[in-house]
């Protein structure tokens, strides 16, 4: 049994000039040129401090599990900062064989009309500050928060899933084909 003291992990993340960061009651607010976002760190066991132009994250323990949680928190903060600076873009392709699918954006929802000849539209929610644009056979989803953009894309893809048929034959749906950092204009 070792009595050697193991070093607690700590990282200092530099905040760019165009980004403002504040923390109150373990809720991290990040504001940048593309918008603002927030992340609740109340249930994540790390020590979080905002200094002038930097964020210091410190693990609370020395075990492997504590290190994994520490690296997850670091990744979350980096994702928030990158999102308000450059944003995220997901591109989806509308695929159909017989009935032409049309996608319309109404009241913060995505309406998929004429999917497999159905009369009622299938409706998916748009999460957060995400923007959705339907151009021809492509649907472009952009936004500053990665979780909102990816959840919008996932709910749209799941909503157009073909059920009770052979998925190798009936390929109709809306599928993700590209995702990258940055918002195209």
Language model regions located:
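Ribosome-associated RNA-binding proteins
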Residues: 1-185
